[in-house]
C-alpha cells in the first residue's frame, strides 16, 4: 500500500477522533461556571437608599399637603419635598411614631412606607431618582464594579433597608439578606463579599453576630467596611439636641429635628462606653455638661424622653467585643475635621459651637478604630487601611478605596 496513502488515512482517523473530543471539551467548559470573581452585596448607611410612600391620611398638617395618593412616590430623596412649607408635609410622612408600651415604632396614620429595589443597586447609586449629583452615592463604585466585569442586579446587588429603624425592627430584612446571599452563592459558585458603608456596617455586624460560624465560613468571603461607626458618633448628640441638615442647604436644622429624633437609628448611634471615656464631655451648656453617663438627663432636658427608651431598646443589640467572624477589611478616613463636642450658649434650640477632632468629617477616629480590638479575637484576618483626607461620603469614590476593593475581589 502506498505509504503516503496510509499516512493520510491515519491523519484523517486522528482528526476524526480529535474533533469530537475537542467539541466535548468545549461543551464541558461551557458547563463550568464562568464566574472568576466573588459576588458582591452592597449595604448602605443612614439615609443611604431611597424610600417610597403611599398616602391615605385622615388629616394633613397643611392644606398644600397631599392627603391621598393612588400610587407610591419617592419620599427620600426628593428635593422638591424639602422646599419651604412642603417640608412640613414631608416630615409628617417620613417620621416614625414610637409606642412606649410595645417598645416599637409605627408609621403615621394613613402612611405606608416601603424600600424599593432590594437586590438591585439603583436605589443606592442615586438617592434622588432624577439622578442629580446631590444624590449620587454608590454610583461610582458600582460603575467601577461593572468595569471589572460585574453586572448590576446579578453578581453585584444592593441590600437597601429602612434606615430609620434599628436592626431589632427590621427582622424581615435580615431574612431576605440571608436568602439572597445563599442564592448568590449557588448562582455564582462561591461566597459573597459584603461591602458596607457607615451605619450599614453596624447592621452587618448585627447580622453576622447572629449567624452560625459554619454558615459564615461557607457563604461569606470577606467583609469590606467603609467608615464604620462601631462605637457610635459624637455628632449624634447635636442631631438630637438641635438637628442637623446633613449639608442640604434648603433644610433648617430645627425643622428636620423632629424627623431625626423619631428615627430610632439616631439614638442607636449615640457614643458607646466601650469606645469613649466615661468622663468625656460631649455637650457643654451654661448649666450642665453631658457625658455618655448622662443620656437619661440629656433626653429629658431636650424634651424628648422617648429617645431614652429608644436607646435602652437598642444599646445592647450589638456586642462590641464579639467580632464578625469573617475576613474583615476596615477602611477609614482621617485628617478631616470631625465634630467631637458641642458648646451651646442657648440649649437646645440654637446651633452650637463645634469642637473638632480627627475622623472623616462624620465618624470619629475613636469609633472606627474599634475593629482593631478584633484582631486578637478572631481567627480570620482583620486588616485596616487608612484613607488620609477622605471624607465620609467621598470615600466611596476614593481611588484608594476602589483600588483596595479591586484587590480584595480580583486578586487570588
From Swiss-Prot:
Membrane topology: Peripheral membrane protein
The keyword Disulfide bond appears for this protein: yes
Disruption-associated phenotype: Mice are born at the expected Mendelian rate, are viable and fertile. They display strongly reduced transacylase activity in lung alveolar macrophages and in peritoneal macrophages, leading to the accumulation of pulmonary surfactant phospholipids with phosphatidylethanolamine and phosphatidylcholine headgroups. Mice display higher numers of alveolar macrophages in the lung, together with a mononuclear cell infiltrate in airways and blood vessels. Alveolar nmacrophages are larger than normal and present lamellar inclusion bodies, indicative of cellular phospholipidosis.
Record's keyword annotation contains Acyltransferase: yes
Alphabetical GO biological process terms: ceramide metabolic process; diacylglycerol biosynthetic process; fatty acid metabolic process; glycerophospholipid metabolic process; phosphatidylcholine catabolic process; phosphatidylethanolamine catabolic process; phosphatidylglycerol metabolic process; phosphatidylserine metabolic process
Effect recorded for residue 89 to A: Abolishes enzyme activity
Disulfide cross-links: 65-89
Localization annotation: Secreted; Lysosome; Membrane
EC code: 2.3.1.-, 3.1.1.32, 3.1.1.4, 3.1.1.5
Catalyzed reactions: a 1,2-diacyl-sn-glycero-3-phosphocholine + H2O = a 2-acyl-sn-glycero-3-phosphocholine + a fatty acid + H(+); 1-hexadecanoyl-2-(9Z-octadecenoyl)-sn-glycero-3-phosphocholine + H2O = 2-(9Z-octadecenoyl)-sn-glycero-3-phosphocholine + hexadecanoate + H(+); 1,2-di-(9Z-octadecenoyl)-sn-glycero-3-phosphocholine + H2O = 2-(9Z-octadecenoyl)-sn-glycero-3-phosphocholine + (9Z)-octadecenoate + H(+); 1-hexadecanoyl-2-glutaroyl-sn-glycero-3-phosphocholine + H2O = 2-glutaroyl-sn-glycero-3-phosphocholine + hexadecanoate + H(+)
Molecular-function GO terms, alphabetical: acylglycerol O-acyltransferase activity; calcium-independent phospholipase A2 activity; O-acyltransferase activity; phospholipase A1 activity; zinc ion binding
Keyword annotations of the record: Acyltransferase, Disulfide bond, Fatty acid metabolism, Glycoprotein, Hydrolase, Lipid metabolism, Lysosome, Membrane, Metal-binding, Secreted, Signal, Transferase, Zinc
Family according to the record: Belongs to the AB hydrolase superfamily. Lipase family.
Function: Has dual calcium-independent phospholipase and O-acyltransferase activities with a potential role in glycerophospholipid homeostasis and remodeling of acyl groups of lipophilic alcohols present in acidic cellular compartments. Catalyzes hydrolysis of the ester bond of the fatty acyl group attached at sn-1 or sn-2 position of phospholipids (phospholipase A1 or A2 activity) and transfer it to the hydroxyl group at the first carbon of lipophilic alcohols (O-acyltransferase activity).
PANTHER family: LECITHIN-CHOLESTEROL ACYLTRANSFERASE-RELATED
Protein name: Lysosomal phospholipase A and acyltransferase
Organism expressing this protein natively: Mus musculus
Amino acid at each position: 500500500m502506498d505509504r503516503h496513502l496510509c499516512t493520510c488515512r491515519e491523519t484523517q482517523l486522528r482528526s476524526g477522533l480529535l474533533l469530537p473530543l475537542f467539541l466535548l471539551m468545549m461543551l464541558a467548559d461551557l458547563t463550568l461556571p464562568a464566574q472568576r470573581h466573588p459576588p458582591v452585596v452592597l449595604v448602605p448607611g443612614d439615609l443611604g437608599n431611597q424610600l417610597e410612600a403611599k398616602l391615605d391620611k385622615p388629616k394633613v398638617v397643611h392644606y398644600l399637603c397631599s392627603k391621598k395618593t393612588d400610587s407610591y412616590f419617592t419620599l427620600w430623596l426628593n428635593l422638591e419635598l424639602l422646599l419651604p412649607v412642603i417640608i412640613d408635609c414631608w416630615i409628617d410622612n417620613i417620621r416614625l411614631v414610637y409606642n412606649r408600651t410595645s417598645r416599637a415604632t409605627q408609621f403615621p396614620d394613613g402612611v405606608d412606607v416601603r424600600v424599593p429595589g432590594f437586590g438591585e443597586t439603583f436605589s443606592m447609586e442615586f438617592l434622588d431618582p432624577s439622578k442629580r449629583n446631590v444624590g449620587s452615592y454608590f454610583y461610582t463604585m458600582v460603575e467601577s464594579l461593572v468595569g471589572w466585569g460585574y453586572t448590576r442586579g446579578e453578581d453585584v446587588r444592593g441590600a437597601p433597608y429602612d434606615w430609620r429603624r434599628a436592626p431589632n425592627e427590621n427582622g424581615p430584612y435580615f431574612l431576605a439578606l440571608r436568602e439572597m446571599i445563599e442564592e448568590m452563592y449557588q448562582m455564582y459558585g462561591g461566597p459573597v463579599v459584603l461591602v458596607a458603608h457607615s451605619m450599614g456596617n453596624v447592621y452587618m455586624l448585627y447580622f453576622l453576630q447572629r449567624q452560625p460560624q459554619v454558615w459564615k465560613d461557607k457563604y461569606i468571603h470577606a467583609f469590606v467596611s467603609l467608615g464604620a461607626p462601631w462605637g457610635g458618633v459624637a455628632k449624634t448628640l447635636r442631631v438630637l439636641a438641635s438637628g442637623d441638615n446633613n449639608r442640604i442647604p434648603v433644610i433648617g436644622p430645627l425643622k428636620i429635628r423632629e424627623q431625626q429624633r423619631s428615627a430610632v437609628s439616631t439614638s442607636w448611634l449615640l457614643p458607646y462606653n466601650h469606645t469613649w471615656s466615661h468622663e468625656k464631655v460631649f455637650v457643654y451648656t451654661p448649666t450642665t455638661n453631658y457625658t455618655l453617663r448622662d443620656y437619661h438627663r440629656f433626653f429629658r432636658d431636650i424634651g424628648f424622653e422617648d429617645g431614652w427608651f429608644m436607646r435602652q431598646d437598642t444599646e445592647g443589640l450589638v456586642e462590641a467585643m464579639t467580632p464578625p467572624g469573617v475576613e474583615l477589611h476596615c477602611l477609614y478616613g482621617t485628617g478631616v475635621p470631625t465634630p467631637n463636642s458641642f458648646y451651646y450658649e442657648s440649649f437646645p434650640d440654637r446651633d452650637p459651637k463645634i469642637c473638632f477632632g480627627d475622623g472623616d468629617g462624620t465618624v470619629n477616629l475613636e469609633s472606627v478604630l474599634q475593629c482593631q480590638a478584633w484582631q486578637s479575637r478572631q481567627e480570620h484576618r482583620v486588616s485596616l487601611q487608612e484613607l488620609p483626607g477622605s471624607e465620609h461620603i467621598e470615600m466611596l469614590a476614593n481611588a484608594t478605596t476602589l483600588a483596595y476593593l479591586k484587590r480584595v475581589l480580583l486578586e487570588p
